[in-house]
């Protein structure tokens, strides 16, 4: 199987703070599969480290009030093209992210509050009917 994975979960230092969300259980489960790592934020041209971003209405804003929507959309489209080119079977994404969150995302207040919703990249994967699992599902914790 070909599985698209948020690169931060595999140990790539691509999070906003320059770190990662390495998940040893995910890495172990993926040993027998073809892994396709992506970080839509980096693909969209955002730096690492960078100012944290959250979805505010229909835009992605950083904590200082800068609009990062174009970079998020660009990165999501590039990552989606990679998913299509590699013909991935499903995706494992980082929860809560404004790009990869699938069931819950931060609410745009930068206070750690969550709301029901999906990030830009998760929405694009859903439009192609690519199944999504979140890194914090019972299977990976």
Task: Give, region by region, the residue ranges found by the protein language model.
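Extreme N-terminal starter segment of soluble prokaryotic enzymes
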Residues: 1-3
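Short, well-ordered beta-to-alpha junction loops that form the rim of enzyme active sites
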Residues: 8, 94-97, 137
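Short, active-site-adjacent cap segments at secondary-structure transitions
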Residues: 11, 45, 98-101
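Short N-terminal binding/cap micro-motifs at the start of the first secondary-structure element
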Residues: 11-18
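Short, surface-exposed acidic-centric catalytic microdomains
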Residues: 21-62
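Short amphipathic alpha-helices and their capping/turn segments at secondary-structure boundaries
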Residues: 22-36, 75-90
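Divalent-metal-activated hydrolytic enzyme cores
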Residues: 43, 53-78, 82, 113-141
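Internal, conserved structured core segments that host functional sites
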Residues: 94-105, 109
């Amino acid at each position: 199987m070909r599985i698209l994975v948020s690169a931060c979960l595999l140990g790539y230092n691509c999070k906003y703070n320059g770190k990662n969300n390495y998940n040893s259980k995910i890495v172990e489960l993926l040993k027998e599969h073809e892994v396709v790592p992506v970080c839509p934020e980096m693909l969209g041209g955002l730096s690492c480290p960078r100012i944290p971003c959250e979805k505010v209405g229909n835009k992605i804003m950083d904590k200082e009030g800068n609009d990062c929507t174009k970079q998020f959309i660009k990165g999501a489209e590039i990552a989606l093209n990679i998913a299509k080119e590699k013909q991935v079977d499903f995706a494992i994404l980082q929860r809560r992210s404004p790009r990869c969150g699938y069931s819950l995302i931060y609410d745009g207040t930068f206070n750690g509050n969550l709301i029901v919703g999906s990030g830009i990249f998760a929405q694009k994967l859903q439009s192609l009917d690519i199944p999504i699992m979140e890194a914090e599902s019972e299977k990976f914790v």
